[in-house]
Amino acid sequence: MAIKKFRPITPARRFMSVMDTSDITSKPTVRSLLVKVKASAGRNNNGRITSRHKEAGAKKLYRIIDFKRNKFGIEGTVATVEYDPYRNCRICLVSYLDGDKRYIIQPSGLKVGDKVQAAESGLDILPGNAMQLSNIPVGTMVHNIELKPGKGAQIARAAGGYAQIMGREDKYVILRLPSGEMRKILGVCMATVGVVGNEDYTNMVVGKAGRSRHLGIRPQTRGSAMNPIDHPHGGGEGKTNSGRHPVTPWGMPTKGYKTRKKKASDKLIISKRKK
């Protein structure tokens, strides 16, 4: 998918780029698959900020995506390719033979009129088809991967994302995840064949502050520009270094310090992610 650039008629437009939308075939047509979601803006149930630099962004409706792919044995046809304001990839509206309609994440190469299906096994290895991991050949690129059977996909859902099946071991399948981590996942978990579309999204340049605000991203203030009460790096006369190793606003080391907690599923990690 191409990236569109602009003539530098303003300083912001000089480097700004947007995704080409020629692949989008329709606006949302199934009202039952659109719901309102109240924006948390990074606040918890007490109204306190728990995730900084977030806001509601532009007004939008959430599209209900079929992450479980549990409609077995019924063939579906891709009716439309649509924009989703909540994610950086495109979504497809799939119309099934029994009249049901569901949204799925668009794999690269899937277009209007193509057929997709979900089953435990026995399907062709084509983009958009979903099967259990144990029944997909070694070396295949997959996305929309479940971590727990029946819970719904949690891994490789962003634009250009995929994991590769590296092998099998007892009831597990070994996957190389987008982060580079090698991990064992139960073979009965569902996954979709192919790579998530809109791969060029990573090359898009936001270009201006207002566009970030539309995306729900607030400005970040440097700790060294704050007062000592607000950040460990704050204070001093003029521009000074903090006099200590870089830390978070709460005093935890911020470069290279491991914060991941141990849990039972760590035993399924064969090799850790790349640095």
UniProtKB/Swiss-Prot annotation:
SMART domains documented for this protein: Ribosomal_L2, Ribosomal_L2_C
Entry keyword annotation includes Metal-binding: no
Residue ranges with Basic residues bias: 257-275
Keyword terms: Ribonucleoprotein, Ribosomal protein, RNA-binding, rRNA-binding
Biological processes annotated in GO: cytoplasmic translation
Record GO terms (molecular function): rRNA binding; structural constituent of ribosome; transferase activity
Region (Disordered): 216-275
InterPro entries tied to this protein: NA-bd_OB-fold, Rib_uL2_dom2, Ribosomal_uL2, Ribosomal_uL2_bac/org-type, Ribosomal_uL2_C, Ribosomal_uL2_CS, Ribosomal_uL2_dom3, Ribosomal_uL2_RNA-bd_dom
Pfam families: Ribosomal_L2, Ribosomal_L2_C
Known function: One of the primary rRNA binding proteins. Required for association of the 30S and 50S subunits to form the 70S ribosome, for tRNA binding and peptide bond formation. It has been suggested to have peptidyltransferase activity; this is somewhat controversial. Makes several contacts with the 16S rRNA in the 70S ribosome.
Record HAMAP family: Ribosomal_uL2_B
Binding partners and assembly: Part of the 50S ribosomal subunit. Forms a bridge to the 30S subunit in the 70S ribosome.
Name of this chain's protein: Large ribosomal subunit protein uL2
Organism: Aliarcobacter butzleri (strain RM4018)
Underlying gene: rplB
